[in-house]
């Protein structure tokens, strides 16, 4: 049934991190910090990130050690690389305001393939860490999205309506629909959805209006 502003009850909102709450650039833009060619295939930053994402390394220190081994860069350069790539995303103030507004009415869960310490550092810097009731991250689970384990971790104990928001329909939201979540896709020019999501938004800032508008989101 549609969610109407007049009868809207608290929901369980599962939010992706990159592409929804924050925007990361292409990490290859900072290849010079490591002294590597950004055109290298595979780019050496990727296996280091994937190792963290998949739980093979468990801390920033271990990531830095691996990145240094892969690139030959100093630990100092690798720490600078982390600062520039993962700890300094674009985080519009409007997004922080949206998070605070949503958290005042709904339960918020952040669900990401990003490393927990990096997410927590950024959320704390912008004063929104307390907006989230839980962080579900693939390094802790050792299973990146779209493995179903993380989706089940995000589900509430009760029967609240569950909505997932992501800019990646094919990788994230199809599995969300499979486990009964309503999908809200942040439109992404780099992706063509396999099928129509339950709702579309242009930016994260549009989410409150969609949740509160008759017919905006047909909850599963």
Segment roles from a protein language model:
Residues 1-15, 109-111, 115-116, 120-220:
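Asp-based, Mg2+/Mn2+-dependent phosphohydrolase catalytic module
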Residues 7, 28-37, 98-105, 152-158:
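Alpha-helix C-terminal capping segments
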Residues 9, 80-108, 148:
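Short, acidic loop-to-helix structural element flanking the phosphoryl-transfer center
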Residues 30-33, 39-54, 81-93:
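Helical cap/lid subdomains and adjacent loops of hydrolase enzymes that gate the active-site channel
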Residues 49-82:
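A metal-dependent, Asp-based hydrolase signature
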